């Protein structure tokens, strides 16, 4: 046990941690040359393409130093803000962390938030400046930032490059010398911390865990504390490039368990595994149920695909326990599901995976957040969907979730960023200068304003330099109204949104204009209206396409032409009464991209 080292890598998106991890695997001969592809640990195609890590991964390496053999367990963590709970559980399974900072970009918001998490868990931090081979690298300046943040010595910072392999041996030495061995009791009752689970179509759910106390053997009868379910350990083992079965996984080691579990709801990240015969007195601290933050309706384009969509979502849920869904129906779109996501990136990834892995074409409605609605009698209910809102006369007030956001940016872009945050109803909390030309700005913002396009706009006004991180802060009372969109007097429930009173008129006008561009012209006139309650606040009209019925009349009496025109008008009127308006998928998504 004294020769085991468990460590994770903390880095902002695109700071090169997956590439550096590849070098570590190569250097310790965990991966042979023929198996080596870029980003070995990112095993979903989507992860490689987007260059982000979505799931936590783990891999074991052997390393020999000064004649001693060591076992190093690298637990790779997602770097994106949506997956911060997964990161926190992965960090809890480690004793040390490599803090990787891009030599060209410096410290970013995500790096800082994950670093604080690591420091809270008492991890040993090994600072690394990566990508020093880039022509635009500024290693000295970035080292100054790290020293200011960590208060470490300049000599402790390792300069490395994932591309050329520079500094890899120093990193491995530092891991062995500085990261403490796991402190567990081999004779205590079994406690394993689950930090991830994956779904295998043949073996069911495979849980990845770190043994904190005791040890687990093949064939043991075990119990998962949070779900109180019991299983037999059909197979336990360690995670090399593939899974390697072992008869026993000892204290401090990282391994996997296969026990024929069918659904991901039974394996919760952060749960504790213990023996049924000799159970641990308590679970490992820090487990929490992950709560979705952003909700959206997901509907199949073809109505008969409803059951397929259900099975696809269930399969995705096997691999992604933070996705929640329940059936709902909409007048405009038929039957579908109300899905809960951790954040916008998570929502996009789920959509892409539905498309790629299951070939499902879906329509997604406008995302919204969950609101607390208080009625006049003092009761409170959570509303995830604008159509679930009670009558306005019954509502006393509505509270919406606020987040505390931290934006790190170059001082040149402070003005435009503050304008953006004010436009989103933000309240400035404080600002701190990190170094001469970098500043961290803290804002309280309503989550509902952020879910749509905040991140894209932030990136574009700061030329890609600003980075953004947030956590839920509290619920606050807001003046919110439900905005309905009517087509020819019929409300389209999938386009309803909750919006703030001050922005409602401009938002309604922009929605109508956008829909006018996107809905194709019909044989009859279409009125697009935005309404709050019974009051219409904006309107656009799509003119009908019409045939020139008087073309075949040459000269002659005007009454003949008038008769034909009247006849056409009658026909159009009848059409309008029975005609339905098709709303294309683009229109539902356009709401997200209103500028």
UniProtKB/Swiss-Prot annotation:
Residue numbers binding GTP: 14-19, 130-133
Q: Which UniProt keywords apply?
A: Cell inner membrane, Cell membrane, GTP-binding, Hydrolase, Membrane, Nucleotide-binding, Protein biosynthesis
Q: What is its EC number?
A: 3.6.5.n1
User: A Gene Ontology MF term for this entry?
Assistant: GTP binding
> So what does this thing catalyse?
GTP + H2O = GDP + phosphate + H(+)
Q: Where in the cell is it found?
A: Cell inner membrane
Family in the record: Belongs to the TRAFAC class translation factor GTPase superfamily. Classic translation factor GTPase family. LepA subfamily.
PANTHER family (UniProt xref): TRANSLATION FACTOR GUF1 HOMOLOG, CHLOROPLASTIC, TRANSLATION FACTOR GUF1-RELATED
Q: What is this protein called?
A: Elongation factor 4
Q: Which organism is it from?
A: Porphyromonas gingivalis (strain ATCC 33277 / DSM 20709 / CIP 103683 / JCM 12257 / NCTC 11834 / 2561)
